[in-house]
Amino acid sequence: MIKNIFQSRKLSGLCVLSILLVSVTILLLTNDTIDLFPYLSLPYLPRSSLSVIPTSTPISSPTNDSSPPLESPVNQTRVDDHPDDQGLELDWLKDDKQWNVSLKIDWKRCESPDYIPCLDNTKAIKKLKSKRNMEHRERHCPERSPKCLVPLPQHYKVPLPWPQSRDMIWYDNVPHPKLVEYKKDQNWVRKSGPFFVFPGGGTQFKDGVIHYINFIQKTLPILDWGKKVRVVLDVGCGVASFGGTLLDKNVITMSFAPKDEHEAQIQFALERGIPATLAVIGTQKLPFPDNAYDVIHCARCRVHWHGYGGRPLLELNRVLRPGGFFVWSATPVYQHDEGHRNVWKTMESLTTSMCWKVVARTRFTKVGFVIYQKPDSDSCYESRKNKDPPLCIEEETKKNSSWYTPLLTCLPKLPVSPIGKWPSGWPERLTETPVSLFREQRSEESFREDSKLWSGVMSNIYLYSLAINWTRIHNVMDMNAGYGGFAAALINKPLWVMNVIPVEGEDTLSTIFDRGLIGIYHDWCESFNTYPRSYDLLHSSFLFTNLSQRCDLMEVVVEIDRILRPGGYLAVQDTVEMLKKLNPILLSLRWSTNLYRGKFLVGLKSSWRP
């Protein structure tokens, strides 16, 4: 009998234990505040019962493996500033059975791992009547943006982190050895084992770029790097060692060069983590506003400033800030044979007619440079005996007129004070009212409100609540930057931001430059002028809803996939309807996605290619 009682109690205990184990298991499986599989989560991912993480391969070293309404303001960059309403806006997700369902798309690979649709349109380039003025290096977009996915280079690796990347990059990520041979005597770049190494040399940097930069300031002390001078344009930048070195002096440089026979110099720059874009001074304006840059630099940049009726130099004059400086380091400055003397005389005549004055001219270790200064008022223009080039009429210089627009043959009138005055020193200019807004009280108020909102939302949401590992982020793009509030809120992070102003929206790019930030005009219905795998993070705030009224959302997503590196992020704030359209497309690309508070969608690009 005692034995039967013992067996009965034993069975009861086993039943209780079984029920307890089942209960714990159900609790674990239904409560996803407990992370059972942390290796499947995105880095620093806050879990909630309504967040969505599709099963996908975690990012490591990417490989080449294969496997099967009412219109709101076009350039609106509003942000969410109500942190306590998250439960109120997620009801739609509970009933949405399609949210985590991938679209079935038969993705194809593009032919080249370095494909740039608007610069590689060979059919359009072959039809050009002339290439004399670099027309073949300008944008020629296909009628329909391609929907293929750019393959990875063989043996592609996760890029080296900043600041290590400034001095060396993986050879396999940019496998273009021609530049090493072509520039072997100029110390631009050399191959060392599995790396490209950048010693800091250049065509004009005989003693290194640091010595060169310091000598420029010593020659003209008013060029106070990182204080008076904050925003620089480097023309024909090579591998961007000039701009990369200036980052240490709190100077942000927009380095640009065409896609040309030097083979991927801009790709080298971006892989190094240095701000750069593909552009050329040909027959059309650069995609920058008037009066933007504090300093423009050209070191043997191979631009014939006096050619094409002087239009290239007039374009520099347009984008140079009143009172700004042009540093020209080239052989005509210091060589004295007849050919170089003739170029110098022509340049002298042209700059005089533009009222530029020489403020310094010197020779530096067998290399010379001259520094010109642009006037800060129209008085010189008006006192010229020969009014050639003439002053522009207002229609030629209206805002947002730098997109597919012919180069000027005239001098834009200079803005009058206080708009024409030099901004405050850095870093004060970042937070002070931009000089371009002084005439517009309403815009000034909007700017203040925008700055306040972005400061809050960055600290409350973007930095700590979204599925973004900021330690891996260096090259950032804000796809519709507004006043640059997103970039300004990140100013203390070791990264840089390319602020893009959509051409169909409000033109606020001058404000961005006034703040000491860099940016560019673009139409997101077309491909961006950059190499594939250039950026770590793309950010969009209410851009896609407005874009969908003009262009194919699928094509925009394909372009984002092209620009982002494997392991890179897309952070989107938009309407519920747009997020519902966007998420299935991202899932079809084998991206991981996560939704925060029903408003913020974060996508993590995988290394998958079709």
Swiss-Prot record:
Q: Which GO terms describe its biological process?
A: methylation
Skewed-composition ranges (Low complexity): 56-69
Per the record, the domain of life is Eukaryota
List membrane-spanning regions.
Answer: 11-31
State the membrane topology: Single-pass type II membrane protein
Query: What InterPro entries does the database record attribute to this sequence?
Result: Put_SAM_MeTrfase (IPR004159), SAM-dependent_MTases_sf (IPR029063)
GO-annotated cellular components? endoplasmic reticulum membrane
Q: Which residues lie on this side of the membrane: Cytoplasmic?
A: 1-10
Q: What is its main location?
A: endoplasmic reticulum
Which EC class, in a word?
Answer: transferase
Which keywords has UniProt assigned to this entry? Answer: Endoplasmic reticulum, Glycoprotein, Membrane, Methyltransferase, Signal-anchor, Transferase, Transmembrane, Transmembrane helix
Residues carrying covalently attached carbohydrate according to the record: N64, N75, N100, N400, N469, N546
SUPFAM superfamilies per UniProt: S-adenosyl-L-methionine-dependent methyltransferases
GO molecular function, a single term: methyltransferase activity
Q: Give the Lumenal membrane side ranges.
A: 32-610
Q: What is its EC number?
A: 2.1.1.-
Q: Tell me its family.
A: Belongs to the methyltransferase superfamily.
Name listed for the protein in its UniProt record: Probable methyltransferase PMT22
